[in-house]
């Protein structure tokens, strides 16, 4: 079981954009308040502008939204990437990194010979945070 006195590594992927801001706040606050110092969290988020329906920078996102809507799935929460670090810090966690598409490709999707094996959408970020 979960022991809040022991360091924990949380992987919270594919969730934040499907729940409310209050749900995100509650989860981040719970982790900050009930986890041992040094515990870590990795989660992804979608840009608030895209969730709000602004597809001007990422036109293909419109198709993704239509497909998800067809399957009765709706994106409801996003974070402004310019405020990503502040958003997480305000909820009691310390950001280690908040990376976008290019850094994701460099770190995780480039083989040793330089071949890129995937291109994530530009409107997602991955955050790595720690409990101070």
Which residues fall in each region the model found?
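Alpha-helical subdomain
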Residues: 1-132
């Amino acid at each position: 079981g979960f022991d809040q006195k022991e360091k924990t590594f949380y992987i919270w992927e594919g969730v934040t954009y499907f729940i409310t801001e209050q749900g995100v706040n509650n989860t981040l606050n719970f982790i900050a308040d009930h986890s041992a110092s040094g515990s870590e969290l990795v989660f992804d988020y979608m840009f608030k502008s895209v969730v709000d329906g602004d597809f001007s920078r990422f036109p293909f996102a419109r198709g993704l939204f239509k497909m998800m809507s067809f399957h009765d799935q709706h994106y409801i929460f996003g974070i402004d990437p310019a405020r990503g670090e502040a958003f997480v810090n305000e909820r009691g966690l310390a950001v280690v990194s908040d990376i976008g598409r290019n850094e994701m490709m460099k770190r995780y999707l480039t083989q040793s010979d330089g071949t890129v094996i995937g291109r994530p959408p530009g409107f997602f970020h991955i955050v790595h945070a720690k409990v101070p």
